[in-house]
């Protein structure tokens, strides 16, 4: 029995003919906007109906428990605390669920690679909260209704922002996630310019913590 899985590690690169097409999604590679993290996953194999599909949110770390279940390994034999959940129940008719140790899903980008600077997103149910560390800004979207992320609900729903931010802070602390910190000696004029002639950000990441499990 052979299963074939097709997936991408991130969204569109955002420029050039070979960078991919992100359609109406915001952002691109190097961000946690939907254009940077949303990409299709295709699985073909025994027992999977042709032309079946679902909109369940999945992530790369779901593959390990999926492989184990296909191989007949009982789920209670897997290491405690793994973040992923098996996708097998989704493959029959697309109506199953993925059981993970946490209901929320986090994408963490503690770098200055993009104009947004270090930022993180947390998903819970239909909501997505984005946190931008340099500006202190939050953005809240109902992804089920606004996949293009055009209607920021943060001002309308401050309690939801606070609740999701609390979950986010707890998660990043639990996994000892890498965070960006100010470097007072950084001179942006000494940073090599990019292809558009722009210099680097005013503050450069100076890591003092080892990388955790948050990912983008």
What is each residue range found by the language model?
Residues 1-49, 59, 197-216:
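Histidine-centered active-site microenvironments of extracellular/periplasmic hydrolases
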Residues 12-23, 27-34, 49-50, 56, ...:
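C-terminal cap/loop subdomain of S1 sulfatases and analogous C-terminal strand-loop tails that border
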Residues 1-2, 78-82, 181-182:
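Short, glycine/acidic-rich hinge or "gate" loops at secondary-structure transitions
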Residues 63, 134-137, 143, 148-216:
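Long, internal low-complexity/basic segments
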Residues 1-4, 39, 101-102, 124-127, ...:
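Loop/turn elements at helix/coil->beta-strand transitions in domains of secreted/extracellular proteins
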């Amino acid at each position: 029995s052979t299963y074939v899985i097709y997936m991408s590690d991130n969204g569109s690169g955002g420029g050039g003919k070979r960078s991919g097409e992100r359609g109406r999604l915001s952002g691109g590679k190097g961000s946690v906007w939907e254009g940077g993290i949303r990409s299709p996953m295709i699985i073909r194999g025994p027992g999977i109906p042709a032309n079946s599909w679902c909109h369940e949110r999945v992530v790369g770390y779901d593959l390990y428990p999926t492989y184990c279940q296909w191989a007949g390994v009982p789920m209670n034999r897997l290491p405690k605390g793994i973040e992923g959940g098996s996708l097998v129940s989704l493959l029959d008719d697309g109506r199953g669920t993925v059981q993970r140790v946490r209901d929320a899903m986090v994408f963490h980008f503690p770098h200055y690679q993009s104009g947004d600077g270090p930022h993180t997103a947390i998903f819970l149910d239909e909501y997505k909260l984005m946190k931008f560390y340099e500006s202190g800004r939050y953005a809240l979207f109902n992804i089920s209704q606004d996949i293009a992320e055009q209607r920021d609900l943060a001002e309308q729903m401050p309690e939801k922002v606070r609740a999701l931010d609390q979950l986010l802070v707890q998660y990043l602390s639990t996994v000892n996630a890498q965070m960006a910190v100010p470097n007072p000696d950084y001179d942006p004029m000494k940073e090599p310019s990019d292809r558009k002639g722009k210099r680097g950000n005013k503050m450069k990441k100076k890591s003092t913590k080892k990388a955790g499990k948050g990912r983008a």
